[in-house]
Amino acid sequence: MGTWILFACLLGAAFAMPLPPHPGHPGYINFSYEVLTPLKWYQSIRPPYPSYGYEPMGGWLHHQIIPVLSQQHPPTHTLQPHHHIPVVPAQQPVIPQQPMMPVPGQHSMTPIQHHQPNLPPPAQQPYQPQPVQPQPHQPMQPQPPVHPMQPLPPQPPLPPMFPMQPLPPMLPDLTLEAWPSTDKTKREEVD
């Protein structure tokens, strides 16, 4: 353990010592520049790779994959939005219609209708009395929006989440009185 600490100290001292001036380096360089210089030299030796990913397999395999990926990605990106645009709007209206507007003709909705009426009334009952009767002990009052496109009327500010506790009474500023001195000669003078 002691040899590793000694080695680390010597290594740190070697990096901290100034180098004599030679071409390509200033006379006195700090540790960060000395560390970055070999990194820049190493990066200049390496062939330039695309910056979008880490290549663990090496350059020979990565160069073979690049043309295949570059040819496959643009068509898939152009096809995915076309596939997702019709599917997402088709799914979004169907999902809200199940709990909000049950259709009696569809048989697939009937088991959902039996389960759904049990759930929404308990969820809707706490929402309706809260706007009518605000309760002071509940800091948040969730209100269902009537229309998402219609702006809500301004509401009074909610009570704070953590109400302020009354502060203890402050002590009035008292005038400083002279402390009794500990020196015998000064004590005689004060007396």
From Swiss-Prot:
The UniProt keyword set, sorted, is: Amelogenesis imperfecta, Biomineralization, Disease variant, Extracellular matrix, Phosphoprotein, Repeat, Secreted, Signal
Q: Does the record's keyword annotation contain Signal? A: yes
What GO biological process terms are annotated to this protein in UniProt?
A: amelogenesis; biomineral tissue development; cell adhesion; chondrocyte differentiation; enamel mineralization; epithelial to mesenchymal transition; odontogenesis of dentin-containing tooth; osteoblast differentiation
Q: Name one GO molecular function term.
A: hydroxyapatite binding
Tell me which residues bear Phosphoserine: 32
Signal peptide from the UniProt entry: 1-16
- Residue ranges of the region described as Disordered: 95-191
Spell out the Pro residues composition-biased ranges. Answer: 118-171
Q: Which GO terms describe its cellular component?
A: basement membrane; cell surface; collagen-containing extracellular matrix; endocytic vesicle; endoplasmic reticulum lumen; extracellular region; protein-containing complex; supramolecular complex
Bilayer-crossing regions: none
- What kind of modification does the protein receive after translation? Phosphorylated by FAM20C in vitro.
Task: Specify one Pfam family.
Answer: Amelogenin
Q: Where in or outside the cell is it found?
A: Secreted, Extracellular space, Extracellular matrix
Q: How does it assemble?
A: Interacts with KRT5.
Protein's job: Plays a role in biomineralization. Seems to regulate the formation of crystallites during the secretory stage of tooth enamel development. Thought to play a major role in the structural organization and mineralization of developing enamel.
Q: Which family does it belong to?
A: Belongs to the amelogenin family.
Q: Which disease is it linked to?
A: Amelogenesis imperfecta 1E: An X-linked defect of dental enamel formation. Teeth have only a thin layer of enamel with normal hardness. The thinness of the enamel makes the teeth appear small.
Question: What name has this protein been given in UniProt?
Answer: Amelogenin, X isoform
Q: Which organism is it from?
A: Homo sapiens (Human)
High-level lineage: Eukaryota, Metazoa, Chordata, Craniata, Vertebrata
